[in-house]
Amino acid sequence: MIVSRFIIKLKTPLHCGGGESLFLDGPVSRDPFGYWNIQGSSLAGVLRASLREIDKDLADSLFGFIKGDLSKASLVWFSDANLLDFDEKRACDKAGNGENVEIKTDSYIRDHVHLQEEGLNRGTSVSGHKFDEEIVPPGAEFAFELKFDEWQYSSDDVQKEKEKFLLLCKIIASSQVRLGGKTVNGYGCFETIYAQYHEVDMRSEDGITQWLNLDNDVCFTSSDAIDIEKDATIVPSKEGYSFDISIPLQNNSMFLPGGVSAKEEDVGTDITCLTTPVLNYKNKTKCIDVYTATGSSIRGAIRHRVFEICNALNLENSLAIEIFGCEADESSKQGKAGLVSCDDAYLKDIKSCVMPHVKIDSFTGGNVDGALFYENPLCGNIGGNIEFDLHMEGRKLTLPQLKILAHALLDLCNGELAIGAGCNKGYGFFKLKGLGEDIKENLSKITLHLFKDGTLLDLSKIDIRESLLSELENA
């Protein structure tokens, strides 16, 4: 028997669906005490899907299968991932024992609007399709454990199955999966801050005694616990091209990532910038509201540019649809998940400024009576710049898809693609930080890990940036 325990910390919002609600379109899952949680079935589903992309037989061996008359039980047991209080104890345990729980699990909402699939160059919304969803804020910490039970194996086969289970643990420790739904919009990204396992021999009397005396704390207290190593080269897909890229962007003008702001200085303003609540366990404080460029907004801007590139090159729109996915078709009733995801960008130490506007009558050229409104775009920090790192991940891409996507990212780096609202006023045009005349020099500032068929490409031997640049010039 192997028991592994983990503590994870959310880097982006999490949305694990919690059924229906009278007041919310998409509530999150909560335990009986009302605290956020991630169900064990959700953890098992994500990790099984990840293993199936690495090795289908490996996934069937650990998680079991049913194939006609053949079947096999799962060897892995999952607990729910329980929310931790600021003292690193399970909030549900403290509530059950009548102890005071400091962390507040209010309802945090994000609004969305559905965009038309046809006429993508317009990017217009569909009437009556505004919806909201509840999120678990970044910074929240959860604890859970996995158990490996090799009861149906002989001692000769146990070592093989143990290695498979430890690979599964390594995937979690390396934060190589995303949890919950909406992952293409950057949700569900986490970092593992604790990962250890403890092994006991259930075939011996001493092992059974160790098992019975094993503590139920969040972390192991025994010195026999072994650290689970991390491996950044694990990729959940061995098909096509996969990548993760981080691009430092900079803007010296206004930026308007529209949404609901919880900051006091934005109260009463007609158009505000979105804020995201972020938990801070170190200072044991309630959520701090941070201005945010959402992953869905960044991904949407890149998506539209990819469609424009396809149209300009007389390529089929199906190339772009395969990259970003599509909703269910009325005839086939089948949708398609996207292959790329973008994380939220949190804009710290950024201030907003009040910009008054008045609607102009196009016939008289004068102002329309009573049509004065205000907006609060972001105007940068003390240095006057707005900076953030764009983080994007992709999987199972073909080479043509990779080239088209690289073309759109180059447009973004060159200040030719806007993010957020107000682009007709010059808002939201970012450039690669420190962009100069030498495009090759500035491309080297981008952090890129590229995999082909599951193998990490050595960029010191294969100048993939040079190759992409050459392909784009030829296109």
Residue ranges, per PLM feature:
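Small/polar/charged residue-enriched interaction surfaces, especially the RNA/DNA-contacting tracks
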Residues: M1-A475
